[in-house]
């Protein structure tokens, strides 16, 4: 084999091997940051406690506003919409008019007819932020003539 032929095989493999093309190693700085975060979270519950408290607060605010919050024992706050087009519309309005990003959850992730929005408040979210989200959702629900919780 000549040098060109010997060189062609690794190039071919690199060009067509999805395991190589779609794999990127993490930088040492990023790995160090992740390790520091894991060590911190193992030693501290401040962030977990804050996230749980904020999830409970947001659930209470949304329920108080009459919005259809689904039962959840986790930090995820699911809000039932029940229609994929309306879920997307709500997400689009939240982003365009309020600067709030949420991903609508549609089929096949959830069964048809059970489309929803899932909010995940973090420990750094404040009560005014969550109040603003609640007010935005209340306004959007009225604008789109969506049913409130029973």
Please identify what each model-predicted range represents.
Residues 48-58, 63-99, 107-109, 114, ...:
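Conserved PLP-binding catalytic core of the aspartate aminotransferase-like
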Residues 12-13, 90, 129, 133:
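Hydrophobic side chains in well-ordered alpha-helices
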Residues 17, 45, 55-56, 137:
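Short amphipathic alpha-helical/adjacent loop interface patches that line ligand
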């Amino acid at each position: 084999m000549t040098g060109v032929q010997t060189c062609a095989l690794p190039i071919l493999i690199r060009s067509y091997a999805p395991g190589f093309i779609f794999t990127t190693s993490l930088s040492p700085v990023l790995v160090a940051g992740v390790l520091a975060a894991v060590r911190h979270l193992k030693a501290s519950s401040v962030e977990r406690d804050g996230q749980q408290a904020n999830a409970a607060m947001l659930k209470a605010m949304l329920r108080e506003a009459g919005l259809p919050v689904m039962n959840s024992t986790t930090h995820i706050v699911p809000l039932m919409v029940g229609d994929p087009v309306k879920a997307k519309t709500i997400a689009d309005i939240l982003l365009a008019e309020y600067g709030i990003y949420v991903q609508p959850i549609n089929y096949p992730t959830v069964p048809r007819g059970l489309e929803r929005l899932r909010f995940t408040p973090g420990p750094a979210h404040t009560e005014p932020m969550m109040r603003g989200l609640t007010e935005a959702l209340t306004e959007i629900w009225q604008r789109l003539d969506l049913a409130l919780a029973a």
